[in-house]
């Protein structure tokens, strides 16, 4: 990870936050723990609502209390996660083995491996060489550099069917770029925007390609099994990719307004320095060749993960095993590039992720999340709404349902069949309504624990939980609006009836 610096590559240090922003942040930090305690106690002690099991109520209390603390930032996020795990165990929400077992989840191993890979790419200078080449060749301005990173995400989604694998490839490149620009983690608006755009681009690009994530394919199967609609690869691409690209363009423009960096980087003078740094790397070294070979093997295994079972008679190597294999190769004497002490693994993030998954999984397994969504649907009175209103409400409910469902797969499994049943009850086209909702499934972008991609980018330290929450909500609103408008325009041109 880049070291904190006091200057940018070609200009003054980033502007400090204004007094109003500082005051708000200070108040939230100061009273966050009391607010979290109040939220927890209010939910824990309230009379048990109809349809919600006692364990579900406890899980809801723990989840919302932890969420409040994560956003407030009163105490370190890993400490909040540890408190959440303790609370789950002491309240009997889940068993101790379940609560503590999240530290052994495959995503934790994936994150450890990703940090090893990142450290290897940084040490070998391969990531620096690629980043410098990319910026000096195509990134004439900081804005163009950001646009190129977004474009790369939209290209590799066709070849690497894993959101986490794509993030694991992009994060080291972003780190090196920001190191070149001397962007200070936590202070640089340019750094915040680059990392947050990485989160948004990964999610939005995935929504446009059916094979971008397993959740998309599960949704397609539900639509076929329960609604009789056959959605092919090109059907999904034609419907989803234009919406994804439009949403990304709007999100990109909004991000430039939210995180202004014009006074932070004097890029006109910095380009010559970047070109000089690129030339100074000289010929490709042995370490870079090793890193390139490991990188190529990793990308190949990730990109072919969905086809290996067909090719090798049921045998396949998952993205998690692939990542650990790559990490082992990086650490292997003679073959690799690193010693263990050189691998910059953020163990505090591992604890944070474990607690986040424990709280989120408890909410799902106890029925708390499903109860919240069901109550919201009933409370809004969807059954009495017009057709247009039903579509808009369902799309936005699906969009923001990731706030309580931490797993895209679980979210898909619960939402899509429910939406199909709702459409059939109301006499609407279940294929169109379910497909529209399916395009929201990848928008897990508002908080770090909502996806593995988020945790990988968040681990860089460039943005806070609150900053991701703000930008994520804006992006979800943009995406929901674009999908809603498209249902009544673009979908009709493609032949989908309401």
Language model features by range: what are they?
Residues 68-76, 152-162, 199-210, 396-408, ...:
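Transmembrane alpha-helix interface/packing and boundary motifs in multi-pass membrane proteins
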Residues 106-116, 160-168, 236-252, 432-442:
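Alpha-helical transmembrane segments
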Residues 180-186, 241, 354-359, 363, ...:
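C-terminal transmembrane helix pair
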Residues 52-56, 74, 103-104, 121, ...:
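Alpha-helix capping and helix-loop boundary segments enriched in small/acidic/polar residues
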Residues 83, 148-149, 197, 239, ...:
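Hydrophobic core positions of alpha-helical segments in small-molecule transporters
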Residues 48, 65, 78-185, 347-349, ...:
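Membrane-embedded alpha-helical segments and adjacent helix-loop junctions characteristic
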Residues 1-110, 235-374, 474-476, 480, ...:
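Hydrophobic transmembrane alpha-helices of multi-pass small-molecule transporters
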Residues 181-261, 453-487:
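Membrane-core helix-loop-helix motifs of multi-pass transport proteins
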């Amino acid at each position: 990870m880049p070291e904190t610096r006091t200057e940018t590559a070609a200009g003054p240090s980033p502007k400090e936050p204004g007094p109003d922003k500082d005051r708000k942040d200070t108040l939230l930090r100061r009273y966050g723990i009391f607010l979290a305690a109040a939220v927890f106690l209010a939910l824990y002690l309230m009379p048990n609502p109809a349809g919600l099991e006692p364990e579900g109520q406890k899980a809801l209390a723990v989840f919302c209390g932890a969420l409040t603390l994560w956003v407030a930032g009163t105490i370190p996020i890993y400490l909040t996660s540890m408190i959440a795990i303790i609370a789950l165990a002491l309240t009997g929400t889940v068993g101790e083995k379940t609560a503590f077992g999240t530290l052994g989840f495959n995503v934790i191993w994936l994150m450890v491996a990703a940090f090893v890979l990142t450290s290897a790419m940084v040490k070998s200078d391969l990531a620096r060489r690629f980043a410098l080449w990319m910026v000096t060749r195509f990134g004439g301005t900081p804005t163009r550099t950001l646009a190129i990173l977004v474009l790369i995400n939209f290209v590799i989604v066709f070849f690497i069917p894993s959101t986490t694998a794509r993030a694991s490839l992009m994060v080291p490149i972003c780190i090196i770029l920001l190191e070149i620009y001397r962007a200070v983690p936590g202070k640089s608006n340019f750094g915040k925007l680059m990392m947050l755009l990485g989160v948004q681009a990964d999610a939005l690009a995935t929504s446009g390609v059916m094979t971008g994530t397993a959740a998309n394919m599960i949704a397609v199967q539900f639509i076929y099994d329960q609604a009789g609609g056959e959605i092919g690869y090109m059907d999904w691409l034609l419907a989803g990719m234009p919406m994804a690209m439009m949403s990304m363009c709007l999100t990109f423009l909004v991000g430039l307004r939210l995180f202004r960096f014009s006074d932070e980087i004097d890029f006109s003078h910095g380009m010559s320095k970047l070109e000089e740094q690129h030339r100074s790397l000289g010929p490709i070294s042995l370490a870079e060749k090793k890193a390139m070979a490991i990188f190529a093997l990793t990308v190949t295994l990730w990109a072919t993960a969905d086809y290996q079972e067909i090719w090798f008679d049921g045998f396949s190597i998952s993205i998690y095993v692939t990542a650990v294999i790559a990490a082992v190769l990086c650490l292997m004497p003679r073959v690799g590039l690193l010693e263990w002490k050189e691998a910059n693994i953020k163990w505090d993030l591992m604890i944070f992720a474990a607690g986040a998954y424990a709280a989120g999984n408890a909410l799902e397994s106890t029925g708390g999340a499903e109860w919240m969504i069901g109550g919201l649907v009933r409370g809004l009175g969807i059954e009495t709404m017009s057709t247009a209103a039903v579509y808009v409400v369902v799309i936005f409910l699906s969009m923001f349902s990731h706030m309580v469902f931490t797993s895209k797969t679980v979210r898909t499994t619960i939402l899509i069949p429910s939406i199909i049943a709702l459409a059939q009850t109301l006499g609407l086209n279940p294929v169109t309504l379910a497909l529209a909702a399916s395009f929201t499934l990848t928008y897990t972008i508002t908080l770090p624990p909502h996806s593995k991609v988020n945790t990988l980018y968040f681990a860089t330290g460039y943005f806070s939980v609150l900053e991701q929450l703000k930008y994520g909500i804006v992006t979800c609103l943009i995406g929901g609006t674009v999908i809603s408008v498209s249902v009544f325009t673009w979908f009709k041109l493609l032949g989908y009836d309401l």
